[in-house]
Structure formats: C-alpha cells, structure tokens
C-alpha cells in the first residue's frame, strides 16, 4: 500500500482526538473503517503508530516521528490546493506569509485580509528554512523565533524587524502536578519529570538542554512535535517548554519558570523595508492581543517583564539588517 494524503490526515486526526472513536466522528467515517485503515498504514510503515488503551490512543515513538513529518506536509498540500484554486479562478493578489508556530497567527492573518488581498500561510518548524524561502522569493514575509544562544543563519539580503527582543519561555505541565499549584515553577521542581522537545525546531533542543544543564539537571527526554507534547502533558507523561501565550486547559497548566531561564527573539523578515512596513503593525497588534489572553503571560507583562526597546538598526547574524521597535 502506498501512503496517501488521506492516510496522513487520518493519523493526525487520531493523534489530535486522542481516540479512534472521536477521530472517526471528526472524519465522518465509521470507527471500524478507521481502525482497519490504521492497521493497514501501520503495516505499510513497519510498526505500530499508536498504543491502544482503554482511555484512548497515544502515539508510539514511531508514531511521533511520522506525525512530526505529516503535519507540515498536510499544511503544504492545503496551501497548494488553495493557491491553485485561486489562480484558476483569477483570484485576488496574494501575500505569501511564512511562520513558525504562534498564537498570534490567526489575528495577524485576519488583520491582513482585505478586499483585493488574500494572505496565504506556510508553516514550518524551521526558522532557517523560512528565511531561505523569503530570500528565494517563495515567501514575501516570515515571522520566526530565534532561541537565545542559537543564532539563526540570516541571509545577507534580508531585512528584519524585532517584535520582541526576549520573549520568556514558560512550561506546560499536567494540571495535577504538584508544581502547578504555584504561579512560578522552579526547574528543580521538575527534576523527576520527563521532558519533551521537538528536535526539528531550530535551536530548541540546544536551548532546553543548556537551560537544564545550568541547574544540574539531566532528565529523561522524549522527542516529538508540539501537538504530541500537549497530549502527553495532559496524560501526565511529560512536561515541555511552551510559548508564554499558550493557554492552560482543564488537564494542563502553563506556568512561568523561575528566573526566566530561556528566551527567544521574535523577528519579522522580508526583502525590503516597505514589505516590513506593510505587515508589521498588524502583527504587533495581533501578538499583544494573544499575549494578554494568556493569564500567566499577562501577569508577567503587568509585572514589568518586557523591556522598552529603542528603534535602531543593527547588524544581524549573517549580515542582514535588523530594526528594533518599541515594545508595548
């Protein structure tokens, strides 16, 4: 059996839903049909992708690997279909936006959309890959993050604008974890926990490893994407670093890390300053809107966490031009 796009959609639906029953309902198929399809996919790939339990399904290590590759492929396929249909219909002008994961995306795209201009979105866990696509003319702008201590490779001909010089990274842990009872968590409180990181995100593993090593921790580490990490946190299997704008859920808690030991720089990249000027205000508004919707991040901001930055161009890693803007 050859793997097809519909098979990848089924796998992602199972992972997101947490059970075959819920995934089948979302896909509009019978559960036995989905179960049979999953078995055939597993046979084609050479091993089990999910463990079946009474409470639902969880990805196996092989499943996490497959899901980590499947999600960006599905995003690319959806973008291809959408852009092809628009081109066939003589559609509106397109603004090609690239981004690493961010809760600001929905608000940003909503603000950019207007008569005669329809933004398209291409997601990628690799900030360096997105920057290369801007340079190559495949994207108009890209919103990326740079893990401190892990400089991005910024092409010479790009211009960048800094949205936030240092966004602190928080931790997502099970809601019933003893440390979740406090608003600020020390890394020592998580010494016995397994951590999950996504090694495909530029700089994430190095940044997390350096943060843990600085306080003498050498925990067990699992590799997987953000969606898998969130589901495993909910079941009490792991803890993970997360963006401060992440929302707590009934089964998970988002908390600040004591001393803010890990941060990222948020950058917008384009080939010209005019392109930056055209989209940056909408991104800025969307980011702070998302930031204040998170209780933990809002409290951190109200405590004076973000520094005021002067506007001034400086040389970026690799020679691109970076502009700082005043934080709100």
From Swiss-Prot:
GO terms for biological process: regulation of DNA-templated transcription. Residues 20-39 bind DNA. Keywords: DNA-binding, Transcription, Transcription regulation. It comes from the Bacteria. Residues 1-60 form the HTH lysR-type domain. PROSITE patterns: HTH_LYSR. GO terms for cellular component: protein-DNA complex. Transcriptional trans-activator of the gene (mprA) for the small neutral protease. This is Small neutral protease regulatory protein. It comes from Streptomyces coelicolor (strain ATCC BAA-471 / A3(2) / M145). The gene is mprR.
């Amino acid at each position: 059996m050859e793997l097809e796009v519909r098979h990848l959609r089924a796998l992602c639906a199972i992972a997101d839903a947490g059970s075959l029953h819920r995934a089948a309902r979302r896909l509009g198929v019978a559960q036995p049909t989905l179960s049979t399809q999953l078995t055939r996919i597993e046979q084609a790939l050479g091993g089990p992708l999910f463990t079946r339990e009474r409470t639902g399904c969880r990805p196996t290590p092989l499943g996490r690997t497959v899901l980590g590759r499947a999600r960006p492929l599905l995003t690319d396929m959806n973008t291809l279909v959408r852009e092809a249909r628009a081109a066939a219909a003589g559609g509106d002008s397109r603004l090609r936006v690239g981004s690493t994961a961010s809760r600001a995306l929905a608000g940003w795209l909503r603000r950019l959309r207007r008569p005669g201009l329809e933004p398209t979105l291409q997601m990628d866990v690799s900030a360096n890959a997105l920057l290369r696509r801007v340079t190559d003319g495949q994207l108009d702008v890209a919103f990326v993050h740079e893990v401190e201590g892990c400089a991005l490779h910024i092409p010479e001909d790009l211009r960048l604008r800094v949205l936030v010089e240092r966004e602190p990274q928080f931790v997502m842990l099970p809601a019933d974890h003893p440390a979740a009872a406090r608003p600020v968590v020390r890394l020592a409180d998580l010494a016995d926990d397994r951590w999950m990181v996504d090694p495909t995100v530029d700089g994430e593993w190095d940044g997390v490893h350096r943060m843990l090593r600085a306080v003498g921790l050498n925990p067990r580490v699992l590799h997987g994407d953000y969606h898998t990490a969130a589901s495993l946190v909910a079941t009490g299997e792991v803890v993970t670093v997360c963006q401060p704008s992440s929302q707590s859920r009934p089964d998970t808690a988002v908390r600040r890390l004591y001393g803010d030991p890990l941060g990222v720089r948020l950058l917008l990249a384009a080939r010209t300053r005019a392109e930056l000027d055209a989209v940056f205000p909408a991104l800025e508004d969307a980011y702070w809107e998302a930031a204040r919707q998170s209780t933990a991040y809002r409290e951190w901001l109200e405590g004076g966490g973000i520094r005021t930055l002067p506007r001034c161009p400086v040389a970026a890693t690799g020679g691109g031009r970076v502009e700082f803007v005043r934080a709100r």
